[in-house]
């Protein structure tokens, strides 16, 4: 690819991630520098932009984004470090048609992942918001996989990668957060907003009924 076009793609990726992180930060999805985002530039070889580690998502600087390969290694010389969970993003890109990945930590997704962890998944059914996932079926039902929050991030990435279901654009990590993806930034944002809406509703139903058996 000509250098000029490559630089244009890189700048687009930076712009997309900066815009997206501010929008989601303003929704309260990135407390205490948590979470990360990425945007794919190329499939073969896999190259994607990912937010750098430990940065406040509510601000924009020239050190917020780094470009990495499928092994999570920087493709250019840099002093910046990619997010510690970059390999989860890589597995998602390798196993799905994702063009953008979003990872957020919220009270609702932590609650749901804790309550349903022993089941290995959380069932969601009969909610209108499922349509936001491009699932248009009567009595629609989906299952979001839940994996343990391994301290070893390599192990975490491997287990999350194994759990990925290309038909359901999300994986939950127990008392940690959710990874959502879409074919582009618009779809990924829509998906994460839909899941967070459904998890908040489910949390309230569990509390109201006094049971996790809400369906």
Swiss-Prot record:
Pathway: Amino-acid biosynthesis; L-methionine biosynthesis via salvage pathway; L-methionine from S-methyl-5-thio-alpha-D-ribose 1-phosphate: step 2/6
Enzyme Commission code: 4.2.1.109
GO biological process entries: L-methionine salvage from methylthioadenosine
Sequence positions that bind Zn(2+): 103, 105
Cited Pfam families: Aldolase_II
GO-annotated cellular components: cytoplasm
Domain of life of the native organism: Bacteria
SUPFAM superfamilies found in the cross-reference section: AraD/HMP-PK domain-like
Cofactors: Zn(2+)
Keywords: Amino-acid biosynthesis, Lyase, Metal-binding, Methionine biosynthesis, Zinc
Cofactor comment: Binds 1 zinc ion per subunit.
Keyword Cytoplasm tagged: no
EC top class named in words: lyase
Membership in a protein family: Belongs to the aldolase class II family. MtnB subfamily.
Name of the featured protein: Methylthioribulose-1-phosphate dehydratase
UniProt source species: Sulfurihydrogenibium sp. (strain YO3AOP1)
């Amino acid at each position: 690819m000509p250098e000029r076009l490559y630089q244009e793609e890189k700048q687009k990726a930076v712009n997309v991630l900066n815009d997206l992180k501010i929008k989601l930060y303003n929704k309260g999805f990135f407390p205490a520098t948590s979470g990360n985002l990425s945007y794919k530039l190329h499939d073969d070889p896999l190259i994607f932009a990912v937010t750098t580690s430990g940065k406040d998502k509510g601000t924009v600087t020239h050190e917020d984004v780094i470009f990495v390969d499928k092994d999570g290694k920087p493709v250019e010389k840099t002093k910046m470090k990619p997010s510690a969970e970059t390999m989860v993003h890589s597995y998602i890109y390798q196993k799905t048609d994702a063009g953008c990945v979003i990872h957020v930590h919220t009270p609702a997704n932590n609650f749901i992942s804790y309550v349903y962890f022993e089941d290995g998944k959380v069932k969601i059914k009969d909610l209108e918001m499922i349509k936001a996932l491009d699932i248009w079926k009567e009595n629609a039902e989906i299952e979001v996989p839940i994996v343990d929050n391994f301290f070893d991030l390599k192990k975490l990435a491997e287990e999350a990668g194994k759990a990925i279901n290309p038909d359901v654009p999300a994986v939950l990590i127990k008392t940690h957060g959710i990874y959502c993806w879409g074919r582009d930034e618009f779809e990924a944002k829509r998906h994460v907003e839909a899941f967070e809406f459904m998890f908040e509703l489910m949390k309230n139903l569990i509390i109201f009924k006094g049971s996790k058996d809400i369906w």
